[in-house]
């Protein structure tokens, strides 16, 4: 289990959706009223999808509800927490 897999999936999904609509990251950023670097960081899995971002994405792509975007982010955070927990367990076992 990789801690970036879900985040990368969300970013890849977002990129595929904007490309399917003939948009660029720059145009998406403009429509959302967000800086381009924020969109790029989300697409590359380095920035979280917040509730505000999810609502903005829903405004630009109304057929994809904000809840969907938030669920992707929640899944990523849970995956990351599980990986951290497993890493901590493995470290404590090695120390014994």
Regions found by a protein language model. Give the residues of each.
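A short, Lys/Arg-rich alpha-helix, primarily the initiator
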Residues: 1-23
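DNA major-groove recognition helix of helix-turn-helix
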Residues: 18, 43, 53, 61, ...
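Extended catalytic-interface subdomain
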Residues: 95-96
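DNA major-groove recognition helix of helix-turn-helix/homeodomain DNA-binding modules
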Residues: 52-68
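Short polybasic/polar patches that bind polyanions
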Residues: 19, 30, 59
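Short amphipathic recognition helices of helix-turn-helix/homeodomain-type DNA-binding modules
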Residues: 65-90
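Short alpha-helical DNA-recognition segment
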Residues: 22-41
């Amino acid at each position: 289990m990789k801690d970036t897999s879900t985040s990368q999936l969300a970013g890849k999904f977002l990129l595929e959706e904007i490309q399917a609509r003939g948009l660029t990251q720059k145009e998406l950023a403009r429509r959302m009223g967000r800086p381009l670097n924020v969109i790029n960081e989300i697409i590359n899995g380095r920035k979280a999808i917040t509730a505000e971002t999810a609502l903005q994405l829903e405004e630009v792509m109304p057929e994809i509800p904000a809840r969907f975007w938030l669920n992707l982010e929640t899944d990523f955070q849970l995956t990351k927490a599980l990986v951290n927990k497993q890493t901590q367990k493995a470290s404590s076992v090695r120390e014994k």
